[in-house]
């Protein structure tokens, strides 16, 4: 969840409905960027702790393979959970 209110009240600001809608859209885009950045940091934290034994000048093949697999699993799991949640929400709407 974000600290931003996605239903920002712009009454009294002099913003036209079109300007308010554009501001809402821009806010949603920025929230998505922030969520993506947070997810990348989460991948980095989890996979770094799992795969990096000792930092060096470059990654060896085992470490690189571990990082790729870790991120792939993380993404697959996130997508699976997201898809399942969407199915539950969709079933609830019917």
Swiss-Prot record:
Carries keyword RNA-binding?
no
The family note in this entry says:
Belongs to the small Tim family.
**Domain notes from UniProt:** The twin CX3C motif contains 4 conserved Cys residues that form 2 disulfide bonds in the mitochondrial intermembrane space. However, during the transit of TIMM8A from cytoplasm into mitochondrion, the Cys residues probably coordinate zinc, thereby preventing folding and allowing its transfer across mitochondrial outer membrane.
- UniProt motif Twin CX3C motif: location: 47-70
One biological process GO term for this chain?
Answer: protein transport
What is the protein name stated in its UniProt record? Mitochondrial import inner membrane translocase subunit Tim8 A
UniProt function note? Mitochondrial intermembrane chaperone that participates in the import and insertion of some multi-pass transmembrane proteins into the mitochondrial inner membrane. Also required for the transfer of beta-barrel precursors from the TOM complex to the sorting and assembly machinery (SAM complex) of the outer membrane. Acts as a chaperone-like protein that protects the hydrophobic precursors from aggregation and guide them through the mitochondrial intermembrane space.
Output the Pfam families linked to this UniProt entry.
zf-Tim10_DDP
Q: Which InterPro entries match?
A: Tim10-like, Tim10-like_dom_sf
Gene3D superfamilies named in the record: Mitochondrial import inner membrane translocase subunit tim13 like domains
UniProt lists the gene as: timm8a
> Per UniProt, which keywords does this protein have?
Chaperone, Disulfide bond, Membrane, Metal-binding, Mitochondrion, Mitochondrion inner membrane, Protein transport, Translocation, Transport, Zinc
Tell me what topology the record assigns in the membrane: Peripheral membrane protein
Question: Record's superkingdom?
Answer: Eukaryota
This protein's assembly is summarised as: Heterohexamer; composed of 3 copies of TIMM8A and 3 copies of TIMM13, named soluble 70 kDa complex. Associates with the TIM22 complex, whose core is composed of TIMM22.
Which species is this record about?
A: Xenopus laevis
**Entry's Gene Ontology molecular function annotations:** metal ion binding
Query: Where does it localize?
Result: Mitochondrion inner membrane
């Amino acid at each position: 969840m974000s600290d931003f209110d996605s239903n920002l009240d712009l009454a009294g600001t002099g913003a036209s409905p079109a300007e308010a809608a554009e501001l809402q859209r821009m806010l949603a885009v920025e929230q998505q960027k922030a969520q993506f950045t947070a997810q990348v940091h989460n991948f980095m934290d989890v996979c770094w702790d799992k795969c990096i034994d000792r930092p060096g000048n470059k990654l060896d093949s085992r470490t690189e393979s571990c990082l790729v697999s870790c991120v792939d699993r993380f993404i697959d799991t996130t997508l699976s959970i997201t898809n399942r949640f969407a199915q539950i929400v969709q079933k609830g709407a019917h």
